[in-house]
From Swiss-Prot:
Pfam families listed in its UniProt record: tRNA_int_endo, tRNA_int_endo_N
Region spans: Disordered: 157-204
Protein family according to the UniProt entry: Belongs to the tRNA-intron endonuclease family.
Species annotation: Homo sapiens (Human)
Known catalytic reactions: pretRNA = a 3'-half-tRNA molecule with a 5'-OH end + a 5'-half-tRNA molecule with a 2',3'-cyclic phosphate end + an intron with a 2',3'-cyclic phosphate and a 5'-hydroxyl terminus
Entry keyword annotation includes S-adenosyl-L-methionine: no
Protein role: Constitutes one of the two catalytic subunit of the tRNA-splicing endonuclease complex, a complex responsible for identification and cleavage of the splice sites in pre-tRNA. It cleaves pre-tRNA at the 5'- and 3'-splice sites to release the intron. The products are an intron and two tRNA half-molecules bearing 2',3'-cyclic phosphate and 5'-OH termini. There are no conserved sequences at the splice sites, but the intron is invariably located at the same site in the gene, placing the splice sites an invariant distance from the constant structural features of the tRNA body.
A single BP term in Gene Ontology: tRNA-type intron splice site recognition and cleavage
Enzyme class, broadest EC rank: lyase
The protein, known as: tRNA-splicing endonuclease subunit Sen2
Classification via InterPro entries: tRNA_endonuc-like_dom_sf, tRNA_intron_Endo_cat-like_sf, tRNA_intron_Endonuc_cat-like, tRNA_intron_Endonuc_N, tRNA_splic, tRNA_splic_SEN2
Compartments (UniProt record): Nucleus; Nucleus, Nucleolus
Active site per database record: 369, 377, 416
Record key words, sorted: Lyase, mRNA processing, Neurodegeneration, Nucleus, Phosphoprotein, Pontocerebellar hypoplasia, tRNA processing
Amino acid sequence: MAEAVFHAPKRKRRVYETYESPLPIPFGQDHGPLKEFKIFRAEMINNNVIVRNAEDIEQLYGKGYFGKGILSRSRPSFTISDPKLVAKWKDMKTNMPIITSKRYQHSVEWAAELMRRQGQDESTVRRILKDYTKPLEHPPVKRNEEAQVHDKLNSGMVSNMEGTAGGERPSVVNGDSGKSGGVGDPREPLGCLQEGSGCHPTTESFEKSVREDASPLPHVCCCKQDALILQRGLHHEDGSQHIGLLHPGDRGPDHEYVLVEEAECAMSEREAAPNEELVQRNRLICRRNPYRIFEYLQLSLEEAFFLVYALGCLSIYYEKEPLTIVKLWKAFTVVQPTFRTTYMAYHYFRSKGWVPKVGLKYGTDLLLYRKGPPFYHASYSVIIELVDDHFEGSLRRPLSWKSLAALSRVSVNVSKELMLCYLIKPSTMTDKEMESPECMKRIKVQEVILSRWVSSRERSDQDDL
């Protein structure tokens, strides 16, 4: 067995992001002289770890590329805006989504169907939707300072880091963060914004005309027990939920209000030429979105446990109760029987500066990125095995020569190297010791790079010598 040759990671041609300081220690330019350590909050729902708070999502993905958006390929960037309309109305300089009238009608129909399933009669459904979707008069401008301060105080538990001589292990209880959601602030309506007009949603004149919506709608409870739905999935003490139509969320005005492009006929031209074809002009009308869709950050079990155990910057809740590190270790093992093995390898590579991601796409356990997926292509495809001192034991995935050659060929075709990561467990380690993450202190790691031997290349190399 020869010593493996290191190949430098291949950088992507086009990079659209800037590299941010990784968790948990911020750089001085990010937070100034006062460095704060924040505890993020996640929830365990249907055997998945979900982060709801928008600020937590941005921090976790931007500083370490943890998790992925449930509606996106990687970075949570889902929006209901129509790209063509956004390009058409680019001079508007607004943060609100711009959608077509047809798309908005679909949202109204979905909201109506949801309320019918909850037992609401047809007249109530029509009355609520008619009041909720009526055009608004003034634009929702930037949030007031009081709401911003309140959001900051409730975004999570922030505590100052105190330097110690040695890195202490996080507390057995995996932290406690504050309320993950922001406060629902009143929004202001927006008048009709005609195409080509000089009306601007963020002008100073509009900022002075901000007023509250004085007609809040009654709450409608959902009898279903779905823990994660497209709307705001907030639980009440009686186990019911409020649908997104009636419960203002914490994701800002872009999820509460939308600009709908609608066509209107020019009255002056109709009066002047009644027999001619009516001239239509498009305009943007601000309406409340009756069926809001939120994107959350989904963490893999390995990523979630690393944030809790290794970095101590995440608190995971199950039914409003924080889970301890030992409980998480046992719960994740029940959910995913191979969790202990995969996490040990994840912890090892993360500690060395790699960004591991799921390697299911290429038939392996992990993919290793330098810095993160936006900057470099994955360098290694990793297969993980837990063995004893003699490299024996029940393998997770017994490989034949045929399957091994297939994996090697797939990895080579996508410019990656196939790595076999052996986690060597002492023969004296008992199953009881494996029930705690402290067992990793006795685990050794052996990395093996698998490369295909090509006879013709070998002969040409010998001829050169």
